[in-house]
């Protein structure tokens, strides 16, 4: 489907009843072709979506609320356009369902159909809200490095290795900003780079991350671009790239890509989320 047909950036009436047809899939292959990524991906991964505004009516018409985490596998054929996801979730607001399991069943079925692959779902009831924690990404934060930069479109040539023996370390920054490719709205994120290999020059990495500041691309695609650029520039033996984007429309998106870790990290929101 063409992005010109997506709800994002258009005035769309909010639905009053459940409508799975609102979900708008976008093929991953379109963007991956520009990154020279084929069917054999150099990573595994998942896109973790957190929904904070989930509500429906029970069988007697009383509102119910919950939160949910959705796990879209990185090898699924499609991503789901975020505004269409928001509208779809809102279509449950005035929909009567016999119980929470009926909601789960519809969510799992509809999202799998849109993504082209099974989608994981963790349903968080109000009884568990008090158990939820907040934490920052692990790692050595590079934000205080004294750099000068005037490049605000992705510049992989900025990346370079530092002298020294092979290291195993985790670097992090809160300075990633990209932009929605449809509306131009800013997307803010914290980024974590975990690797084993020649030392990555930290100032160079920070400049590279900042260079996304005027770039227009979906969250998932930005993370895959970062992964590929680091692999080409520094050739680490092991690499994980993880971004946690701030929420918009009651949803946050957190793409994770790795060539050595088999399980995604715990889905713990950061302070800005």
UniProtKB/Swiss-Prot annotation:
Pathway: tRNA modification; tRNA-queuosine biosynthesis. GO terms for cellular component: cytoplasm. It is an enzyme of class 1 (oxidoreductase). Its EC number is 1.7.1.13. One of its GO terms (molecular function) is preQ1 synthase activity. Substrate binds at residues 80-82, 219-220. The active site is at 180 (thioimide intermediate), 187 (proton donor). GO terms for biological process: queuosine biosynthetic process; tRNA modification. NADPH binds at residues 82-83, 248-249. Pfam families: QueF (PF14489), QueF_N (PF14819). Belongs to the GTP cyclohydrolase I family. QueF type 2 subfamily. Homodimer. This is NADPH-dependent 7-cyano-7-deazaguanine reductase. It comes from Bordetella pertussis (strain Tohama I / ATCC BAA-589 / NCTC 13251). The lineage of its organism: Bacteria, Pseudomonadati, Pseudomonadota, Betaproteobacteria, Burkholderiales.
């Amino acid at each position: 489907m063409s992005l010109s047909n997506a709800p994002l950036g258009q005035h769309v009436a909010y639905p009053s009843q459940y409508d799975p047809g609102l979900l708008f899939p976008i093929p991953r292959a379109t963007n991956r072709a520009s990154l020279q990524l084929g069917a054999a991906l150099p990573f595994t991964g998942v896109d973790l979506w957190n929904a904070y505004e989930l509500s429906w009516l029970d069988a007697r018409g009383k509102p119910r609320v919950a939160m949910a985490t959705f796990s879209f596998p990185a090898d699924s054929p499609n991503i789901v356009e975020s505004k269409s996801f928001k509208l779809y979730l809102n279509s449950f607001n005035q929909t009567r369902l016999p119980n929470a399991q009926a909601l789960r069943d519809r969510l799992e079925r509809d999202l799998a159909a849109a993504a082209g692959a099974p989608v994981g779902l963790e349903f968080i009831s109000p009884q568990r809200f008090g158990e939820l924690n907040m934490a920052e990404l692990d790692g050595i934060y590079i934000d205080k490095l004294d750099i000068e930069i005037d490049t605000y479109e992705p510049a992989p040539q900025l990346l370079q290795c530092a002298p020294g023996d092979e290291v195993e370390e985790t670097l992090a920054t809160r300075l990633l900003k990209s932009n929605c490719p449809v509306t131009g709205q800013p997307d803010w994120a914290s980024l974590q780079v975990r690797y084993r290999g020649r030392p990555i020059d930290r100032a160079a990495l920070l400049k590279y991350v900042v260079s996304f500041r005027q770039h227009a691309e979906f969250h998932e695609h930005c993370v895959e671009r970062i992964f590929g650029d680091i692999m080409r520039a520094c050739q680490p033996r092991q690499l994980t790239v993880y971004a946690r984007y701030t929420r918009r429309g009651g949803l946050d998106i957190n793409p994770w890509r790795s060539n050595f870790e088999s399980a995604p990290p715990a889905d713990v929101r950061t302070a800005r989320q």
